[in-house]
C-alpha cells in the first residue's frame, strides 16, 4: 500500500462519498454511496472502502 492509497482509505472512513467521488467521479457508485450515507453511515463506509480498495 502506498501513501496515496492510505490517504484514500482514511478519507473513505471519515467522508465516504468524497472518497468514492475521487475514485469514480459522478457515476453510479457515488449515488449508491450517497444514498447509503444518508440512511445508514456504516454501510457507506464499507462501500467506500470496497470502491477504494478493489483495484
UniProtKB/Swiss-Prot annotation:
Family according to the record: Belongs to the UPF0057 (PMP3) family.
GO BP term (any one): plasma membrane organization
Which PROSITE patterns does the annotation name?
Answer: UPF0057 (PS01309)
* UniProt protein name: Plasma membrane proteolipid 3 homolog
Enumerate the UniProt keywords alphabetically.
Answer: Membrane, Transmembrane, Transmembrane helix
| TM regions (residue ranges) | 3-23, 31-51
- Whether ATP-binding counts among this entry's keywords is no
Q: Name one GO cellular component term.
A: plasma membrane
Presence of keyword Transmembrane: yes
Give the range the annotation lists for the signal sequence: none
Q: Which domain of life is it from?
A: Eukaryota
User: Where does the record place it?
Assistant: Membrane
